[in-house]
Amino acid sequence: MGSQTMAVALPRDLRQDANLAKRRHAELCRQKRVFNARNRIIGGDTEAWDVQVHDQKIKEATEKARHETFAAEMRQNDKIMCILENRKKRDRKNLCRAINDFQQSFQKPETRREFDLSDPLALKKDLPARQSDNDVRNTISGMQKFMGEDLNFHERKKFQEEQNREWSLQQQREWKNARAEQKCAEALYTETRLQFDETAKHLQKLESTTRKAVCASVKDFNKSQAIESVERKKQEKKQEQEDNLAEITNLLRGDLLSENPQQAASSFGPHRVVPDRWKGMTQEQLEQIRLVQKQQIQEKLRLQEEKRQRDLDWDRRRIQGARATLLFERQQWRRQRDLRRALDSSNLSLAKEQHLQKKYMNEVYTNQPTGDYFTQFNTGSR
């Protein structure tokens, strides 16, 4: 029977059934939202809260997994540290054992450098102080051989005496040769000195003759120079007098003493002057400055008058504004007072009507509502 019904169902009926099911589902969702007092009163976003709770759980799970991972890593690191510590102890023990074996095998007491100080057989092994002059044990600090205590002392002494005799004979021969050479040198020096004396006398005569000639020529030259100097001084004095006269004339006729104002003009422009030549402002400039000062005074007086008028205008406006504000506040106060009186009268009349209505309801409605009465409400979302 059901298969026959499905066979004859039209698409329009299927759409109606789907729309009906959709409206029923929407109604149930609406009832769930409307009848939930918490969401309706507080206005909380349940979906957002659920998302936050879900995110918080995910975060807690992630933190828990991270802590567990850290704990596992710490346990693994502790195991590794224990293994490394045991290995270090074992290596230290092996190293100590190897050092002991090496000392016993290769560092025996008889191989030490200071063993000869504590050797019990030192006297038996001891050698004489020296066996020859070139003995390697015969050092400077050993003090076993001093100067002149070698084994071939007599042969060496005889050889030294022969050597001294030869040196003495050689010195005598050298002294005789040096004496003969000194005599020859003295004779040559005496002869050379006599020749130098003759040459010096001749040169002295020539120098005396030349000095006389030079003195005569110098005297003539000095005389001519003195005459030229006197003439030059006369010319210089004359030129100096002429220059002084020309300078005085130029100063008297120049711009400095005549106080020409044009001399202070600068080549950089008409607004610039030369400070060391400026003699002060001209009468036209002073008049121009006084005129500008008068104009500035008049302008300042005009600005002061405008400021005074502006201040008076602002004071007048401020007083008018304060007066208007005071009047507006008084008007508002009167309106509020009238409104409060009207509101009090309206509240009083409403209270009387409510009291009468309550009294009427108490007289008319005598039965009390039961639970069935309240269950018929809030059955739908509309």
Curated annotation (Swiss-Prot):
Keywords: Cell projection, Cilium, Coiled coil, Cytoplasm, Cytoskeleton, Flagellum. It is found in: Cytoplasm, Cytoskeleton, Cilium axoneme; Cytoplasm, Cytoskeleton, Flagellum axoneme. It holds the Pfam family RIB43A. GO terms for cellular component: axonemal A tubule inner sheath; axonemal microtubule; nucleus; sperm flagellum. InterPro entries: RIB43A (IPR008805). Microtubule inner protein component of sperm flagellar doublet microtubules. PANTHER family: RIB43A-LIKE WITH COILED-COILS PROTEIN 2 (PTHR14517:SF10), RIB43A-RELATED (PTHR14517). This is RIB43A-like with coiled-coils protein 2. It comes from Homo sapiens.
